[in-house]
Amino acid sequence: RRDNRLRTSAMVETRGVRIVIDAGPDFRYQMLRTGVRHLDAILLTHEHKDHIGGLDDVRAFNFVDYPPTVHKVHIWAAPRALECVRKDFDYAFAQDKYRGVPEIELHEIDTAKPFRVGDVEIVPVSGHHSERFEVTGFRIGTLAYLTDFKTIEDAEAEKLRGTEVLAVNALRFAPHPSHFNLAEALALIRRVGPR
């Protein structure tokens, strides 16, 4: 049996704003496959390579007009994830950048406060990928997206009340040390009660 899956990611379009959640190593292929030509922001759930490994390919969204004008892609993440982006893609932040590097602008998320991309309010939802490793989910209107969650505190789960769509990870049937299994994901769904 072959594993043909791609790394998890989501694209949300609302109020004229296009947002991608996570840009793993398959980011370029995913964008080509869907024919996306414009991107306003990328929200990062955490700094693991399967969620940030494709950030170099945002360069395709930097120069889409003719004559070419630089369109920076805005990246939103918690402090720890931003630190890894700065380290892993240091050439994008160099004083003397070479031509063609990704043009990105980083924005730090305070998980206690909503933030905006254009006219779209985004509510960060904090959880844990493992005992000591934080991960951020996002609520955009009536949609919420949580990936690589293992635990979520009651106050954070409350941010999900009133959602119509809850996309949540469920790695497998058996328990796992750093991801919800199916029973845990279903328990969160029952707790939150999305439509």
Model-flagged regions — what are they?
Residues T151-R195:
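Cap/insert and terminal regions of metallo-dependent hydrolase folds
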Residues R37, P102, G118-V120, R161, ...:
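Structured loop/turn residues at beta-strand edges in well-structured enzyme cores
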Residues R18-A77, G162-V165:
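Active-site metal-binding motif and surrounding structural segment of the metallo-beta-lactamase
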Residues T34-V36, D56-A60, F89-A92, G137, ...:
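Short, glycine/charged-enriched secondary-structure capping and boundary segments
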Residues T69-K72, A81-L106:
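Active-site neighborhood of divalent metal-dependent phosphoester bond hydrolases
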Residues Q30-L32, G53-L55, R86-K87, E134, ...:
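Short glycine-/acidic-enriched loop or helix-start segments at secondary-structure transitions
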Residues R1-T34, E105-E158:
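Core dinuclear metal-dependent hydrolase active-site scaffold
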